[in-house]
Amino acid sequence: MPTLATTVNGLKLPNPFVIGSGPPGTNANVIGKAFDEGWGAVICKTVSLEADKVINVQPRYARLRSRDSGEIYGWENIELISDRSFDTWIKEFREVKQKYPEGILIASIMEEYNKNAWHEIVGRCEEAGVDAFELNMSCPHGLPERKMGAAMGENPDILEEVCGWVMQVAKRPVWAKMTPNVTHIEDPTRASLRAGCDGIAAINTIRSVLGVDLDTLRPEPTVEGYTTPGGYSCQAVMPIALRMCMEIATVIKREFPGRTLSGIGGIETGKDAAQFILLGADTVQVCTGVMKLGYDIVKPMQEELLAFMEKHKFNRLEDFKGHSVQYFTTHADLVKRQTEARAAKKAEHAKKMIRADAEWDGDDFVKQTDALARG
């Protein structure tokens, strides 16, 4: 029988489905709800030492719907990191670990360009019992104005330095969360892994403008008549996320074997998860999907992933992790392969043609005649 249980960076997860950082992990109550529903791990909403600087606005979401069915497939947010005090988070980390000692609790953390601040937040979170860290180097809105989030993640030199600060003191596994708002995601990936990070999480949201209201002529989501570009997620980003995960997995395999990848971007079903794992992910994160469909989607997701494994006779996630990466190549190689395949097919067809009268066979007379004909 196949199993979804897996061990990632020494963390034992009952399944690879992880609550991604955001509203679904915004306090102890909802984190507990996620564990009760059966999620493999939970990443809290990003925390910082100075939550008093975080001020959210309303509304802060805008959604894109199918013209035909009305289903939500695109989601923009201009939400910031947690506005709850760091002391409150430390208290709730302890409460969660006391109530769910086997639950894998991952702290998403973000700070300004300050070595002491990064050392402090890591040390205090570890004392509170968190099992791992995800470094939010990738939020595309609001925080970059303070040189945080994507402002760090877009600069490989700064990223490597800050990840290095964290690795100086961290005693738990560390994942660096990548911004997709770069030309080559391999560059920040290498920077994070050179600094010693245990894994990569990708992707965070894509900087975007969801649309403009044609009645008010104001862009969405509108706050007092104005807005700011936000982060785009949901089903629509999955093709971009898959491409970037494939690129990251290729870097890991070739240059940093043993490091891990947590795939993020539009995942709502077990089949979605299977695609990310086939392209090299060890775990998959779901955030917008939970906001759209609820915490209980983890059950059908597990069932669907197990059904996929049974169909292909895979017993463990490791049996198919990264399997499909091998089928990516260059366009020049595609042309070469197609040219060779057509030549081979033409040669095979030529073999079936009669070259001399002695080769005519009464049993295959019609087929032999057709082989010699055009049209």
What feature does the model see in each segment?
Residues 275-286, 291, 296-299:
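Structured C-terminal cap/extension of enzyme domains
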Residues 45-47, 137, 204, 288-289:
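Short secondary-structure boundary segments
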Residues 51-68, 209-229, 291-314:
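C-terminal helical cap(s) of enzyme catalytic domains, especially alpha/beta-barrels
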Residues 17-20, 105-108, 174-178, 262-263, ...:
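Short catalytic-loop micro-motif centered on adjacent basic/acidic residues
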Residues 252, 261-264, 285-287, 293:
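Helical hairpin unit composed of two closely spaced alpha helices linked by a short loop
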Residues 1-106, 110-115, 119-120, 301, ...:
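N-terminal capping/small domains of soluble enzymes
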Residues 263-264, 319-327:
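A glycine-rich phosphate-binding loop feature that marks nucleotide/adenosyl-phosphate handling sites
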Residues 32-37, 41, 98-99, 112-262, ...:
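Alpha/beta enzyme core
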